[in-house]
A protein has these predicted regions:
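Active-site C-terminal subdomain of aminotransferase-like
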Residues: 82-182, 187
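Conserved PLP-binding active-site segment of the aspartate aminotransferase-like
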Residues: 34, 196-202, 217-235
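A glycine-rich phosphate-binding loop feature that marks nucleotide/adenosyl-phosphate handling sites
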Residues: 15, 71, 122-125, 188-196, ...
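Conserved PLP-enzyme active-site core in the AAT-like
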Residues: 1-116
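Conserved alpha/beta core surface patches that mediate binding of polyanionic ligands
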Residues: 128-134, 212-219
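Conserved PLP-binding catalytic core of the aspartate aminotransferase-like
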Residues: 184-212
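Anion (oxyanion) recognition and catalysis
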Residues: 56, 180, 213
C-alpha cells in the first residue's frame, strides 16, 4: 500500500490474540484498521461490534482479514463474527475451508466505486465500461479462478457447507482434549478450527512438530506464541 513502517501501529491484544478495545490507538480519516476473523494461531475473532463503529465514527476504513474464519458466518458458530458485516472490506481464502486449489482468494469491498478507482487499468488503447471486471483487480487478464469456488459451493450447498464447518469445529475440540490427555499443552480455547499446541519444553515442541512433518501423514504448522515455539493444527 506504500505505507512506511513508521506508519504502522500495532494494537495491544488480550490473552487470546484479540485487539483490546480499551487500548485501541487513536484513529482518524487516514486510518486503516485491520481486524481478524479467525486469528491465525488461536482462531479467535476481534470484537467487531465494538471496534468497527468506533473506527467508523473516526472516519477510518475497516478491513477484516477472514482468510479462514469468515466462513464461520455460514455455520452454527456465526455468533463469533457478530458485527463483521459492518466493515468496509473483507478478504477470505477458498483454499482453506472450501478445500479449493491454492490461488483461490477473494476480496470483497463495500464501495464498488472506490475499488474500481483504485484498480483501474484503463488506457487509450483499452478503455472499458464503468463496471468492467478488469477494473476490480490488479490483473488485466486472468484465468477463471472463481470456477473452483463456485463448484465447491454448488456441490456442498448451504447445508453441506454448514455441516462441514460445524464438524471441523467439533473435531478441533476433540483433538484438543486428546492432546491434553496425552500430556501436551493446548494454548487456545479452540473456538474454531485451530488448535495451538506446545510440549513441556521448547525442544519437545520442535521435535514433535518435526516428527509429524517428516511422517508425511500430517502437518503441524510452526509458529511462535507469546515468545515461545508452538505448533498449529488446522482442521
Amino acid at each position: 500500500l506504500g505505507f512506511g513502517m513508521n506508519r504502522l501501529h500495532y494494537a495491544a491484544v488480550d490473552a487470546h490474540g484479540r485487539i483490546d478495545p480499551a487500548r485501541l490507538p487513536a484513529q482518524d480519516a487516514r486510518t486503516l484498521l485491520i481486524l481478524q476473523a479467525g486469528e491465525v494461531n488461536t482462531g479467535e475473532f476481534d470484537h467487531f461490534a465494538e471496534l468497527i463503529p468506533r473506527a467508523r465514527e473516526a472516519g477510518a476504513w475497516v478491513h477484516v482479514d477472514g482468510a479462514f474464519g469468515l466462513w464461520a458466518r455460514a455455520s452454527s458458530s456465526a455468533h463469533l463474527a457478530e458485527g463483521v458485516e459492518l466493515a468496509d472490506s473483507w478478504t477470505s481464502d477458498g483454499h482453506k475451508w472450501l478445500n479449493t486449489p491454492y490461488d483461490s482468494a477473494m476480496a470483497i469491498c463495500r464501495d464498488a466505486d472506490a475499488l474500481a478507482a483504485a484498480m483501474n487499468s484503463d488506457a487509450a488503447y483499452a478503455t472499458a465500461s464503468k463496471d468492467a471486471q478488469k477494473n476490480l483487480t490488479l490483473e488485466f487478464s486472468r484465468r477463471a479462478r472463481g470456477v473452483a469456488i463456485w463448484a465447491a459451493l454448488a456441490s456442498l450447498g448451504r447445508d453441506g457447507l454448514r455441516e462441514m464447518i460445524d464438524r471441523h469445529i467439533r473435531q478441533a475440540g476433540e483433538l484438543a482434549e486428546a492432546l491434553r490427555a496425552g500430556g501436551y499443552q493446548v494454548l487456545n480455547r479452540t473456538v474454531l478450527n485451530q488448535v495451538l499446541v506446545r510440549g513441556d519444553t521448547d525442544e519437545q515442541t520442535i521435535a514433535s512438530r518435526e516428527a509429524a512433518q517428516a511422517s508425511g501423514e500430517v502437518w503441524f504448522g510452526p509458529t511462535i506464541w507469546q515468545g515461545r515455539p508452538a505448533f498449529r493444527l488446522s482442521l
